[in-house]
Amino acid sequence: MGTITIDGRKVEFTDEKNLLTIIRKAGIDIPTLCYHSELSTFGACRLCTVEDDRGRTFASCSEEPRDGMVIYTNTGKLKRYRKLIIELLLAAHCRDCTTCVKSGDCNLQTLAHRFGVTSVRYNNYREQKPIDFSSPSIVRDPNKCILCGNCVRVCNELQGVGALDFAFRGSEAMVMPAFDKEIAKTDCVNCGQCQIFCPTGAISIRHNREAVWEALADPDTRVIAQVAPAVRVAVGGAFGLPKGKSVMGKIVNVLHRMGFDEVYDTAFSADLTIVEESAEFLDRLKNGGKLPLLTSCCPAWVKFVGEQFPDYRENVSTCRSPQGMMSAVTKEYFRNPENSQGKIGRAHV
């Protein structure tokens, strides 16, 4: 245990691993683009740089706290540093912010506004790279990458896949799959974690919004939506509601107003999956099938086992995922002439 003076205020610490954690616990907002407590410390963006009483500057995310330290987090020097860092990042960044899928939710854009970066004094020196649309789950745009390394670390450290890594050095450095392959031709399991950790639009979720709107506009198409359990407690935060609050009723109301004819809860098919997997387990147990039985609820997990542990492929359940099972159930139900009203369109949320 020790005490650090931060901006003139004494703050006690115990077992915090770095200065950044202590500073944030003290209620001081330090900007970062590459730091995540779940990942290893990388120290790439340098936005969390602080100054000590001797005028020395260092990244707080990688600095071990010491008793008696005197730290300043918002001096004039630090403000200039941070503004310059944002400018340099933008100098090597694609600037089509108005049409970017991450516009309004981009950490780099937010920090540029915060530090008053209204223009960039430097020309973009990077050669434009092709956008990778090969994956069914994500879109990778290397022109918007700021080399924070978040996607590389989450793919390696948390997911254990290693589909992305750094290549080349200096001004030529970039993040890419091995041998610059398309992401779909790598060991990527389509988990989407890289997109969650990406602070810009370099990795975004692949969507089919246009197809959904076309289906909703077609009077001859019966459009069905199914909502995953996680969505009901996650979507509310985007509209200012308390995090974790269930908004299933609001979701159903909104989807009906948009034009969806039917809205189903994927939790129902999750129960179906449990029933089917239980039956499969009993069958394997009685008849000497491959054990242990591994769930097939998550397509990313199934692909991960197939790619990383091929010897265990036969251990994975043959059941569909809850979303796949719900889709099959609704398709079979409305295929019946008594229930059918023309074409069927389905949207998974």
Predicted regions and their residues:
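Short strand-turn-strand beta-turns centered on an Asx-Gly dipeptide
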Residues: 6-9, 52-54
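Iron-sulfur-associated redox domains of electron-transfer enzymes in respiratory
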Residues: 15-68, 74, 78, 206-348
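A short N-terminal beta-strand-loop micro-motif at the entrance of redox/enzyme domains
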Residues: 9-15
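Fe-S ferredoxin-like electron-transfer domains
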Residues: 46-190, 196, 203-222
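Short structural boundary motif marking the start of a folded domain
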Residues: 1-4, 347
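Structural motif corresponding to the C-terminal cap of alpha-helices
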Residues: 159, 198, 334-338
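Residue-level recognition of alpha-helix initiation/capping sites
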Residues: 14, 136, 146, 189, ...
